[in-house]
Every structure is written in structure tokens, then in C-alpha cells.
Regions:
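Short, hydrophobic/amphipathic alpha-helical patches that form generic packing surfaces
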Residues: 37, 69-86, 287-296, 480, ...
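Long, contiguous amphipathic alpha-helices that act as assembly "spine/axial" helices in icosahedral shell
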Residues: 74, 104-151, 278-312, 347-379, ...
Length: 577
């Protein structure tokens, strides 16, 4: 049977499944809250417990932060990953085909470029670039981040990011996150607007009836593959199911059961071990240093306080007397007791320089763990004689350190974003292609060459290209070696395919396909040039023949002969008497 919002069986099953998912995450929560306290105090939503509930969302949270290096390092990591991997200022992905020869066809190349341009426009218009920094922050701090990509009538797509602590995840047999359960809060008014008053529990109905519109209600939401899918045209029988219900309601009743043609769930981890659902992060590695840093900073402040405002000793005669420590003030004592004034209890002079150096070492360890030295490499290098080549090599070498996480982010986050966005664009454009609707489609119809062809995504961001820099260096070395050999034997250049070298280098550099001429057009251009060269050669030969004939005297030339045709091409006309 197909589950409907009315039968309640689906709600019971998901309440039971949610309990198992909560049990899986329990062991991570204490660790996450420590990471939150030391690296990202304003992140996290622990709304169902006593920690940062709805009434305390605006209160101060950075009470454990004395030295801000961990927070600044997290901000640098998030900004560096955003600008290095998904910068809105430059293309960071490219669509191509599995067959390189197919991608070189002019019509295919132009269509792929048009779709890329449309997708970049959609991403810029949506809130993607406002959400991604938070995603990078979460995987850097907690090792796990999650959001959904939803269709939008105004912006084509929009993204909603979920804070750590508010959701629970499960993964498929392929170790990919495909199930989300989360808890959040809506006011009574928002619930009625979103789901309708008839779908609400009796408790919410009574609140709405009594005008308690701004009362907060805990709501549960789940997104998962539809394992009981039956194709009968109903929304809850789509490949992916989305379900809402009230967390505190005693009724086994869904607020709504909706569906998606493709999964909107986007779960990403920094790195994982074995069958773990939740990931590990660089902040987990730096947590000990962050705790030590705050303790050292506290002890340094205490030491400075003891030097500037030390504990004092005083004679007993001053016990009940007025004593002032204010600048310029006077404390009266007898002349016989003038040597028995206030004095520090001990002459202690802490080595503040050594303490400061130790703090700097802890700060440096945190920055290195969070790749701050990588993202701020040029800022930290104060040498004036560094060469451009050295800058490039050092930049590429350091960026290689992010290779594993870049590959994982591309695989778990960016690739699904591009796939789902492309599916949405195709679905919205198809009625215009088929003439069912009038107007311009979001993307043009694909050329015939791409029928039944699955497209491939290539990432060309700064971080992705750093992984390909080894190929560029190898190509440069090969051509440099061939050039040196060609001075002794020019025939060695026949071993190199210069056209293919241009194409591959352009791909590695992420050059726009409009700059590189497709192979079929290059062949046409070369054929036209060859024909022009043949015609020019024939004209030269004809003119030379005409000159020879003129010198020889009146010789009649048959126009059907090769000489006659050459003279005709050259414009010499018939020659003879």
C-alpha cells in the first residue's frame, strides 16, 4: 500500500527510526559542544535541551574565549575554502562529456558553455554563496555539515543550511549521506501558514483559536529515500520523501508528506573513518591546543595583574585606618611607622616574555592545524627578493595539502549541487522545448550529438587546479626538452601533437571554451587556407608561364591543356596569333 498523511503508520515508524538515529549521534555531542565553545560559539542549535533554547538564543556565548586566535583561524579557513574552491568571482566548474572528441564538436562545446553560464547565473542569484561559508565552517569545526537544495519559483533554486546539533544523519550502503532527521521550531502562526490548520494537532488548533500565534512549537522533519515507493502518481510516492510532524504531539499524525524527484539532501564531511556517519575535523586535532591557549592566556593575565596590582602587606596599625591606592592620594601614618607602609607580599617578577612566546607557539599550532598559513601564505612572507616562479611553486605545494578534503567536498557537496541544479533546469525547460509553453527556456535544447549522453563535471577552482599543476609542470618540461632536441634534430617535433597540447593545457587552466577553437572548425579553417594556398600557387605558375610564352613569341596555347588552364587561372587569357 502507499502511505498517506492520514493513516499514521508512517509517523509511528519514523518516530522509532528517529530514536535510533539519535542514539547513533549521542557519543559525538559532548565533543561537538567543546568544539563549539572554543572555535565557533555562535554556531550550533541545541534547541531540545537546556542549552541555547529558544529563550536564550541571543545571549553571550563566548565566555570561554580569552584569546581569539581559534575563532579567527576558523574564519580564515571558511573564507579560504570559499574563495579557493567555490569563488563567485571566477568559474569553478565545467561541464564536459566522457568522450573528449565529442566535447570538441562546436555545437556541443557551445551548448555546454551556455548551460554552464546559466548555472553560474542561477547560483549567483540564489543564496548559495551566502550558505557555503557556513558549510565550510561547520566541516572545519565539527567535521560534518548539512543543507538542502530546494526549487524556487523566483530564483530557480535556494539553499537552506542546518546548524550542527539540530539534525541527525544516516548513510546508504555506498557510505553516502541519504537520510536526514532534524528538529526545529516554528510559531503557531508559521505552522498554520505552512501546513494548514486541518493538519495540525488539537493542541496547536486550540492555540490558534486562542490567539497564541507566537508560541514556539517543536517540529520534526525527515528526508529519506522512499523505500516503499509505488508509482501511482501521488506526491509521497516520489523517489525521495519529505515528512513533517509535531515533536510533542500525542497523535500519530503527519503535518505533511511531500516528495522530490531527486534528493535535495547535501551532507558533507571533512574526513571519515570506516563506517562512521559523522566526520572528523581539523579543529578536533587542534582542540587541545585551543584549551591550552586559553589557559595560558588566563595565567598570563593573572601574572600581569599580580605585577601591576600585587597583594600587599601592611602594619597592624593600619587595620582600621583609611588606606588609598589611588594615584596622588595620601595615607596618613605616624612618623615612627613611616618605614612600615604598604609593600608587596613578595618580590615576584614573572618572565612575561617566556609566557608570551609559549602563547605564540600555541597560536601557531592552531593556525597550522586550520591551514591559516596556507591561505595567508603571501601575507606571511615578508621577503622582498622572492621570485614569481618560487611563489607559484610554493603556492602549489601548499595547496596540495588540501587535496583529500577538496576531493571529498567536490564528491559529497559540489557534484550533487550541480547534478540537482542541472536536473531542475532541464525539468523546467522541457515544456518549452516540446512547444507546450511559449517563451524562452532556462537552457537551450541540447544538440543531437548529446542524445543519451551523460555529462561529466570537471572542477576548475583554484584549489582544484592546484591538484592539476603537476600535469602542467610535466607538460612544460616535455616541451622544453623537445625544443632543446629540435635544435639538433628538428624531426623530433613530429612526436608532439601541438593541437592536443593546446586543448589539454586549456582544460587544466580552466580557460573558457570560447577562446579555444573547436577541432572541426580548425579543420575547416586549415582546409580553406590550403585551398587559398593552392590557388595562389596556381596563379603564380600561370603568370610565370604567360611571361615565358610572351618571351617566346606568338605561340597559340590550347585552353584544354594544363598550361592553358594555368594561364586562365592567372588571368593571362588566350595567348597566340
Amino acid at each position: 500500500m502507499a502511505y498517506t498523511p492520514a493513516n499514521g503508520e508512517l509517523c509511528k515508524r519514523w518516530k522509532k527510526r528517529a530514536a535510533h538515529m539519535k542514539n547513533e549521534r549521542t557519543s559525538y555531542e559532548t565533543h561537538w559542544q567543546e568544539l563549539q565553545d572554543h572555535f565557533a560559539p555562535r554556531s550550533g542549535r541545541w534547541i531540545r535541551g537546556d542549552r541555547y533554547s529558544a529563550g536564550e538564543r541571543g545571549r553571550k556565548r563566548n565566555h570561554k574565549i580569552i584569546n581569539g586566535t581559534p575563532l579567527l583561524s576558523v574564519n580564515t579557513l571558511a573564507a579560504g575554502m570559499t574563495s579557493g574552491n567555490t569563488s563567485p568571482a571566477r568559474p569553478w566548474f565545467r561541464l564536459t562529456t566522457p568522450d573528449p572528441q565529442l566535447a570538441e564538436i562546436g555545437a556541443v562545446k557551445q551548448w555546454l558553455y551556455a548551460v554552464e553560464a546559466r548555472m553560474r547565473e542561477v547560483f549567483s542569484k540564489s543564496n548559495l554563496y551566502r550558505v557555503l561559508p557556513t558549510i565550510y565552517r561547520d566541516i572545519g569545526v565539527y567535521g560534518t555539515a548539512c543543507m538542502v537544495e530546494l526549487e524556487d519559483d523566483d530564483d530557480v533554486v535556494r539553499f537552506e543550511q542546518f546548524e550542527i546539533g539540530s539534525y541527525w544523519l544516516a548513510q546508504s550502503n555506498r557510505k553516502r549521506i541519504d537520510t536526514l532527521y532534524r528538529e526545529f521550531q516554528l510559531t503557531v502562526r508559521q505552522i498554520v501558514q505552512e501546513f494548514g490548520v486541518d493538519a495540525c494537532s488539537e493542541r496547536v488548533k486550540n492555540m490558534a483559536k486562542n490567539g497564541q500565534w507566537e508560541t514556539w512549537i517543536d517540529v520534526c522533519h525527515a528526508i529519506a529515500p522512499n523505500d516503499e515507493r509505488y508509482i501511482d502518481g501521488e506526491r509521497w510516492d516520489m523517489p525521495v520523501r519529505s515528512m513533517y510532524w509535531e515533536a510533542s504531539g500525542n497523535e500519530d499524525k503527519m503535518l505533511a508528506v511531500r516528495g522530490f524527484e531527486s534528493s535535495p539532501l547535501l551532507g558533507c564531511r571533512w574526513t571519515t573513518s570506516g563506517e562512521e556517519v559523522y566526520g572528523s575535523s581539523p579543529c578536533m586535532d587542534a582542540l587541545g591546543d585551543a584549551k591550552a591557549l586559553q589557559l595560558k592566556e588566563l595565567r598570563k593575565a593573572e601574572a600581569i595583574d599580580k605585577v601591576v596590582n600585587p597583594p600587599l602587606i601592611a602594619p597592624t596599625s593600619l587595620r582600621n585606618q583609611r588606606v588609598s591606592m589611588l594615584p596622588g592620594d595620601i595615607t596618613y601614618v605616624d612618623s615612627q611607622q613611616s618605614q612600615a607602609g604598604l609593600k608587596p607580599i613578595h618580590d615576584w617578577r614573572p618572565d612575561l616574555n617566556a609566557i608570551g612566546e609559549d602563547i605564540m607557539r600555541s597560536e601557531e599550532l592552531i593556525r597550522r592545524a586550520l591551514y591559516v598559513d596556507l591561505f595567508l601564505m603571501m601575507q606571511n612572507d615578508t621577503r622582498s627578493n622572492i621570485t614569481a616562479r618560487e611563489i607559484q611553486e610554493r603556492h602549489e605545494e601548499k595547496l596540495l595539502m588540501l587535496g583529500p578534503v577538496v576531493e571529498r567536498v567536490n564528491d559529497e557537496l559540489l557534484d550533487p549541487i550541480i547534478d540537482r541544479t542541472f536536473d531542475i533546469l532541464v525539468r523546467k525547460s522541457r515544456p518549452y522545448w516540446e512547444g507546450l509553453l511559449n517563451g524562452e527556456p532556462l537552457i537551450p535544447p541540447p544538440p543531437e550529438e548529446l542524445a543519451e549522453v551523460d555529462l561529466k563535471v570537471e572542477f576548475i577552482s583554484v584549489l582544484a587546479q592546484a591538484q592539476k599543476a603537476v600535469g602542467l609542470s610535466a607538460m612544460d618540461n616535455l616541451f622544453g626538452f623537445a625544443a632543446s632536441l629540435a635544435q639538433m634534430n628538428p624531426g623530433v617535433l613530429d612526436k608532439l601533437d601541438f593541437d592536443q597540447a593546446i586543448d589539454e593545457r586549456a582544460d587544466m587552466l580552466g580557460v573558457s571554451p570560447r577562446i579555444v577553437v573547436p577541432d572541426d572548425k580548425v579543420a575547416e579553417m586549415r582546409e580553406a587556407k590550403a585551398q587559398q594556398a593552392q590557388q595562389a600557387q596556381a596563379m603564380q605558375q600561370g603568370m610565370a608561364m604567360a611571361e615565358m610564352v610572351g618571351k617566346a613569341g606568338g605561340v597559340k596555347v590550347d585552353q584544354t591543356t594544363a598550361l592553358g588552364r594555368a594561364l586562365d587561372v592567372a588571368g593571362a587569357g588566350p595567348v597566340g596569333v
